[in-house]
UniProtKB/Swiss-Prot annotation:
Protein's UniProt name: Ribose-5-phosphate isomerase A
The keyword Isomerase is annotated on this UniProt entry: yes
GO cellular component: cytosol
Organism: Hydrogenovibrio crunogenus (strain DSM 25203 / XCL-2)
Enzyme Commission number(s) of this protein: 5.3.1.6
Domain of life according to the entry: Bacteria
Amino acid sequence: MTQDELKQQVAIAAIEYVVPDTFIGVGTGSTANFFIDELAKIKGKIKGAVASSEATAERLKDHGIPVMELNSVDELSVYIDGADEADPKLNLIKGGGGALTREKIVLAVAKQFVCIADDSKKVAVLGKFPLPIEVIPMARSYVAREVVKRFGGEPVLREGFTTDNGNVILDIHGLEITDPVAMETELNGIVGVVTNGLFAARNADIFLCGTANGVETIKA
C-alpha cells in the first residue's frame, strides 16, 4: 500500500471516534486532511469542528463543515490529528506543518486525543524527526543557543515560514529524546519559546496506526 492509502485507512478508522452531536477538534497536515475528507461524509452528525490552523479551517469550510472559534466552545469530545513520530508510550513529535501551538491549545480542550498516522511514524525513541519549536522572532538566536547548551542538537531556522501566530520555527536536528515529558517542560521554560512539538505532558490516548495488514489500535 502507498503512504497515502495508509493515511486514508486510518482516517476512515478515526470516524468511529467521532461522537455525534458534539464539537470535535481537527488537526493539521496530510493525514488530518484525509480525515477531514471522511468527516465530510458524516458532517450532519456533529455540531461543528474547531480547527488547529487556517489551512484546516479552509478545508473544513470547503466541505461545508461548521467551523467554530475555540473561545466559543467549552469542550471538545475528541481531537483527531496526525504525528511526525510516536514512541511506544504514545509521546509524540508534532509540528512538521508548523501548527504546533494551535494544535496544543485545541488539544487542551479535548476529552480524548486520537492520533492517526502510518507505521513509518512509529519509533523506539523520539528525535530522528527534527523537533519544531515555535519562537518569538526576536528571541530566535537566544533560544537556539539555550537549546544547544541544554540538550545539544542542531537548531535550523525554517526558512521562509511564519506560523499562523506570526512567529518563526526552529527545527532541532540530531536529538535523542529519552525523557520527553521533562524536555517538553524545560523547553517551554526558555524565554521566547511559545511552545515545542513534544506532545508528552499530554500524549495521545489512542494511536490508529496504518499498516499493510490493516489499522493497528495502540492505547497509551
